[in-house]
C-alpha cells in the first residue's frame, strides 16, 4: 500500500504488503521487502534495501513526544535486515540521522534522535538508546546495548552482549562480562 502523496523514484521495488506513508520519499534503486512499514517525514537516499518486517520512521518511544511530524533522514546504500526498527526524532528541531553504507542486522534498533555515521555495523539485536551516536566504521556486536546519549567512536568495537553507559572512545574495544 503506497500513499498517493509518497514520493518514490520510478526504479524503487516494493514487495507485497509493504506500507509507505504520505511523507516518505524514496530514492533510486531502493528495494522494499514484504511487510515493511515506512512512515513519518522520512527522506531515504538511493540503493537502500529494507528486508521483511522493518519499521522505519515510526514515532519515538518517548513520553515527551507530542505527535509532531518529526524527521528521520537516511543516506545511501544501507542494508536493513529483518525486523529492524529506526524511530524518528522526538523534537521538530532535530532529526534521527542514518548516514550511508551501514549494515543493520536482524532485530537491531535505532532510537529517536540517534546519529549513525557511515559504514557502521549493528549486529543482530543491537540496541541504541535515544540520542546515541555511532561514528564511522564502528561495529556493535550482537545483543549489545548503547545507553541513551552515549557515543561509540570511529572504528570502536563492542563485543557481543556488552553494554555501555559512558562514551566508547574511537579505536577501542568494549567487552561484556
Residue ranges and their predicted role:
Residues 1-174:
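Structural signal for interior beta-strand "rungs" in well-ordered beta-sheet cores
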Amino acid at each position: 500500500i503506497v500513499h498517493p502523496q509518497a514520493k518514490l523514484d520510478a526504479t524503487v521495488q516494493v514487495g507485497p504488503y509493504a506500507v509507505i506513508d504520505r511523507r516518505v520519499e524514496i530514492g533510486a534503486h531502493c528495494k522494499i521487502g514484504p511487510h515493511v512499514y515506512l512512515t513519518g517525514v522520512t527522506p531515504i537516499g538511493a540503493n537502500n534495501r529494507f528486508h521483511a518486517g522493518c519499521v522505519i520512521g515510526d514515532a519515538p518511544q518517548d513520553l515527551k513526544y507530542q505527535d509532531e511530524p518529526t524527521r528521520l533522514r537516511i543516506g545511501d546504500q544501507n542494508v536493513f535486515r529483518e525486523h529492524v526498527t529506526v524511530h524518528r526524532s522526538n523534537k521538530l528541531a532535530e532529526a534521527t540521522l542514518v548516514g550511508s553504507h551501514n549494515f543493520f542486522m536482524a532485530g537491531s534498533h535505532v532510537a529517536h534522535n540517534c546519529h549513525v555515521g557511515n559504514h557502521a555495523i549493528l549486529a543482530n539485536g543491537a540496541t541504541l538508546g535515544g540520542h546515541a551516536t555511532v561514528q564511522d566504521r564502528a561495529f556493535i556486536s550482537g545483543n549489545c546495548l548503547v545507553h541513551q546519549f552515549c557515543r561509540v567512536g570511529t572504528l570502536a568495537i563492542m563485543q557481543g552482549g556488552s553494554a555501555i553507559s559512558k562514551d566508547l572512545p574511537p579505536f577501542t574495544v568494549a567487552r561484556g562480562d
